[in-house]
Amino acid sequence: MKRLDQVLAADGVNAELELVIKDVMVACKDIAYKLGQGELAGILGATEDENVQGETQKMLDVISNDLLKDILVANPYVRGVGSEEEDYTIAGNADGKYLVTFDPLDGSSNIDVNLSVGTIFSVLEAQDDQSGDNQEVFLQNGRKQVAAGYVLYGPSSLLVMTTGNGVNLFTLDTNIGEFVLTKEALQIPEDTAEFAINMSNQRFWEPEMKQYIDDCLLGEEGPLAKRYNMRWVASMVAEVHRILIRGGIFMYPYDNRDPSKAGKLRLMYEGNPMSMIVEQAGGASSTGRMDIMDVAPQGIHDRVPVVLGSKNEVAKVVAYHTK
């Protein structure tokens, strides 16, 4: 089986970017180990702090964030890092070529009940000579990403990533401590009858999203003429992974609980990297009205509505929002 570094070399990834990705994996392997220890290591539960998003931080949120941040700012090729858990971007090497953004532990509300969580990351090229602690250097749309991926910590630890040449899946071989290639060129089925959404928020959605879900629930007799199944794990990494393997559509739409927020999920840490992965696997991603990766970020913590997965189903949701 091919190791990660062999696959990156075959894809023509340069040595600098390869080292950045490998450092992300060093941190993720450490996170996987700590998650496996769980209560034995005394690292479950919440802190008394909130992150910049206003969310109570789990202890493993903080630990995972520090592992990724510390190894990346020490990398000679990293200009700066941005994290969902940090108020501001952080400078790395002034001569670094790359910027890395990440959600250190997506779905962390699942930790204490031993359900799947994950790490999401995105790599951009620094476009000018500004320092990495200036967020302006990060404000590029998702089309500018040179790599994106996630690590799913489940029964096995899986890396799914793209450098713009398709999507590959790697499994962490704990015997050798390396991610090895186990599936190549993942492709999302174009059609689906499975959706993932948090139905408890339905009363807050826009009318277009309400109508789409209502039509899904009408089954074969409804306008969509399908019997749909619903899934919800409360972990974007787990939801997207299921879609990559068997198809489906994931939605976290705009809701009106806080009109000042464009959505729940963060563009730079979740929307863009997951959109790159999904589109590279033949799927589609949208806010409901435009492609997520075409959204111009105004701030490092911008939020965005998310609809992604099997491309024909995403097109149906977009049609509801644009007719």
From Swiss-Prot:
Pfam families: FBPase, FBPase_C. Mg(2+) 1 binds at E84, D103, L105. GO terms for molecular function: fructose 1,6-bisphosphate 1-phosphatase activity; magnesium ion binding. Its cofactor is Mg(2+). It is found in: Cytoplasm. Substrate binds at D106, G107, S108, S109, N198, K264. Belongs to the FBPase class 1 family. This is Fructose-1,6-bisphosphatase class 1. It comes from Hydrogenovibrio crunogenus (strain DSM 25203 / XCL-2).
